[in-house]
Amino acid sequence: MNINVLTLFPEMFTPLQVSLLGRGQEDGKWKLNLVNFRDFSDRPHKSVDDTPYGGGAGMVLQVKPIKDALDSLENKGKVIITAPQGKTFNEQMAQEWSKEENLTFICGHFEGFDQRVYDLADEMVSIGDYVLTGGELPTMSMIDATVRLLPGILGNALSTVEESFSDGLLEYPQYTRPADFEGQKVPEVLLSGNHGKIDEWRHYQALKATKLHRPDLLEKRDLTPEEVRMLRQIREDEQAEEDKL
């Protein structure tokens, strides 16, 4: 996979050069191409913004240097722009993007874009209902979520299958040694060696965590009869705990 990023601050993307993603680049599993669109400005001092037509506070990033930077790319693929008005990024989008050969992200900073910049993009995407100083951090988050799904990036392919959101549920609790830490014990079922019981416990706990923290995910889910039974049991267990109080 080849990922292009148009940005005024390419140095911000250093974190993508380390850990699993950095190793993935070294192994040739993906490539990051950082393009400073300031280099495509033909104005004095390489300026890339100007005052808005019609007046108003602040400055607006110009379309020409960004368009010229895009045109310089050999393989653009899907063009994505980070914007508060975009649809919210999620795991399904990461999975879809991970199947692309080329992706291009456009990052703003401080100012908004000339409206014609948005017309250059195939998708407008946000990471949440809040405002940041630029699009670099959202872009890094989306790149991380996408690239980690590529074959060979994670050591264990099952890791991407069993973790939160991959099947529409939050992840079940996990434990490692010691089995007893200051009186806090690992659930006995995980020590039993009975993989059928362990799978059932994990499914139950994933449903329980999702019901508690992200009930909206359950509303979108086509529940199996077994999940309906488990959720009924979860409600009964919760009621029993309340009755003890």
UniProtKB/Swiss-Prot annotation:
Keyword Metal-binding: no
SUPFAM superfamilies xref list: alpha/beta knot
Catalysed reactions, as listed in the record: guanosine(37) in tRNA + S-adenosyl-L-methionine = N(1)-methylguanosine(37) in tRNA + S-adenosyl-L-homocysteine + H(+)
Listed GO MF terms: tRNA (guanine(37)-N1)-methyltransferase activity
Pfam families: tRNA_m1G_MT (PF01746)
Source domain of life: Bacteria
UniProt-annotated location(s): Cytoplasm
Alphabetized UniProt keyword annotations: Cytoplasm, Methyltransferase, S-adenosyl-L-methionine, Transferase, tRNA processing
Residues annotated for S-adenosyl-L-methionine binding in this entry: 108, 127-132
Entry EC number(s): 2.1.1.228
Keyword field contains Ribonucleoprotein: no
Single biological process term from Gene Ontology: tRNA N1-guanine methylation
InterPro entries, sorted: Alpha/beta_knot_MTases, tRNA_m1G_MeTrfase_C_sf, tRNA_m1G_MeTrfase_TrmD, tRNA_m1G_MTases_N, tRNA_MeTrfase_TRMD/TRM10
One GO cellular component, as annotated: cytosol
EC class of the enzyme, as a word: transferase
Transmembrane intervals: none
Record function comment: Specifically methylates guanosine-37 in various tRNAs.
Family: Belongs to the RNA methyltransferase TrmD family.
Subunit structure of this chain's protein: Homodimer.
PANTHER family noted in UniProt: TRNA (GUANINE-N(1)-)-METHYLTRANSFERASE
NCBIfam families recorded: PRK00026.1, trmD
Protein name as catalogued: tRNA (guanine-N(1)-)-methyltransferase
Gene source species: Lactobacillus delbrueckii subsp. bulgaricus (strain ATCC 11842 / DSM 20081 / BCRC 10696 / JCM 1002 / NBRC 13953 / NCIMB 11778 / NCTC 12712 / WDCM 00102 / Lb 14)
